[in-house]
């Protein structure tokens, strides 16, 4: 009898320990998961303020002072020209309603109502249309009408959570539809930088309008999981497991998408639209190897441009002529 009671006590203790562990794990998941959702993909999060705490996790060559000077001088020059262009070219505010009901806003820059060539230019993570407006200027100079939207949860667009490209690829289809409704004969190029690049790559594997003729991606990442794993190591010196797993669970519930499913790498395997891959070999945010993996995985017509000594989305400032010549040559091939 006493032995039986002892077994019951032991079993009870085991159950208490197991339940306690479950409660601790659930609590940790909620706490850690919510922290990283708030930090990384909340509209008001601090994920855009990047501070690298683990330098060893960022394996890129340093950009020398002379190169940095060239990049900054070209950036300033391009921005000044782009601001002048945006004030002179005819433009109008436009908006669409996303599949989940939020309102997305952007600006069309009209070179000529009669022309069929259009480009949609997408900005990056925690950024704005101003960061990519010089790209629109170069396309306009080549005879394109230009659409530059605010990504969801950015600027004038609604939304509480950043889509990291996965939700944004559905938003992109709404913008494509807007142009096609205006001009059924439109020829549309998609250009994305950073998260915008991930967006156009993630869209490439879906069925897009026949009006979409080419995709240009600059500094895109292989998947949401991969970029967050890289940044967890660089920013917080934290391991992928279990941090990202906790993040994934809470992001699924709050932001309504799965960071593990959100893969540009898997999407480009299904792509049929021509893609030009561009990357700087000194990118310390999205490592160059991600570009190489994406390029190798793509099963469509493709080309690649790697700019030496360029950091994240800096290729167009490091070698401006090379950058745009490659883009417009790609269309004529």
What are these regions (language model features)?
Residues 71-114:
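N-terminal cap/lid segment of alpha/beta-hydrolase-fold proteins
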Residues 202-257:
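Hydrolase active-site cap/lid region
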Residues 264, 273, 287-296:
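Short alpha-helix in the alpha/beta-hydrolase fold that links the catalytic acid
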Residues 136-158:
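Conserved alpha/beta-hydrolase
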Residues 131, 162-183:
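Alpha/beta-hydrolase active-site loop
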């Amino acid at each position: 009898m006493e032995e039986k009671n002892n077994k019951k006590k032991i079993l009870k203790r085991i159950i208490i320990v197991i339940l306690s562990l479950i409660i601790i794990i659930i609590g940790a998941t909620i706490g850690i998961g919510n922290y990283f959702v708030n930090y990384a993909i909340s509209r008001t999060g601090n994920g855009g303020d990047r501070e690298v705490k683990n330098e060893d996790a960022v394996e890129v060559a340093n950009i020398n002072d002379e190169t940095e000077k060239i990049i900054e001088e070209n950036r300033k020059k391009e921005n000044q020209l782009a601001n002048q262009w945006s004030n002179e070219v005819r433009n109008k505010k436009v908006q669409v309603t996303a599949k989940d009901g939020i309102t997305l806003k952007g600006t069309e820059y009209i070179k000529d109502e009669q022309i069929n060539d259009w480009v949609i230019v997408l900005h990056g993570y925690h950024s704005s249309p101003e960061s990519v407006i010089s790209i629109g200027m170069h396309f306009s100079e080549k005879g394109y009408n230009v659409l530059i939207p605010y990504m969801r949860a950015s600027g004038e667009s609604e939304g509480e959570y950043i889509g990291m490209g996965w939700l944004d690829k559905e938003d992109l289809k709404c913008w494509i539809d807007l142009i096609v409704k205006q001009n059924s004969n439109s020829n549309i190029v998609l250009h994305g930088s950073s998260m915008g690049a991930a967006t156009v790559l993630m869209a490439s594997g879906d069925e897009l309008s026949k009006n979409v003729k080419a995709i240009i991606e600059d500094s895109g990442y292989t998947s949401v999981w991969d970029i967050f794993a890289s940044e967890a190591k660089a920013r917080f010196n934290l391991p992928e497991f279990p941090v990202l797993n906790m993040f994934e669970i809470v992001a699924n519930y709050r932001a309504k998408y799965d960071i593990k499913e959100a893969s540009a790498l898997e999407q480009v395997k299904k792509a049929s639209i021509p893609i030009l891959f561009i990357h700087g070999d000194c990118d310390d945010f999205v490592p160059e190897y991600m570009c190489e993996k994406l390029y190798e995985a793509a099963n469509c017509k493709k080309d690649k441009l790697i700019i030496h000594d360029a950091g994240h989305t800096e290729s167009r400032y490091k070698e401006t002529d090379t950058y745009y010549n490659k883009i417009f040559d790609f269309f004529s091939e």
